[in-house]
C-alpha cells in the first residue's frame, strides 16, 4: 500500500518502488561470518593470520520515551563457542609458541559479557597486530 501511495503522491509508477522503504534499508542480522584474525604472543616476533568465525550483524535496539535508570541494548554476541589452539612459527627457544583463540559456533542478540567480549563502540580490528607498531626507545 505504501509504495502505491508514494507513487501516486510522487507521480511515479509503483514498479519503481519494489520494496517498502523500511525493507529497502534492512541491515544484516546477527549471524556467523568468516573473519581473518591476527594471532600474536609476547616474545614471538611475528603475527600469524588465521581464519575463524565471529558474530557480526545488527540487533534490534530501543530508545525508551521515559528514561529509566537501567537501559541496556542487545549486541550481537556468541551463543556458543569453542577454542582452537595454534602454534606460532618463529618463536625463540624458551617462549611457548601456543596460542588459543575463540571460534564462534552460534550467535544471538544478548547482553554483552564484558569479561569475554569487546563491547566498545570502536574496538581494534580483528587483524590488528601489536608487532606492526614501531616501538621507539
UniProtKB/Swiss-Prot annotation:
Its main location: secreted. InterPro entries: Cystine-knot_cytokine, Glyco_hormone_CN, Gonadotropin_bsu, Gonadotropin_bsu_CS. It comes from the Eukaryota. Pfam families: Cys_knot. PROSITE patterns: GLYCO_HORMONE_BETA_1, GLYCO_HORMONE_BETA_2. Residues 1-24 form the signal peptide. CDD domains: GHB_like. Keywords: Disulfide bond, Glycoprotein, Hormone, Secreted, Signal. Heterodimer of an alpha and a beta chain. This is Gonadotropin subunit beta-2. It comes from Acanthopagrus latus (Yellowfin seabream).
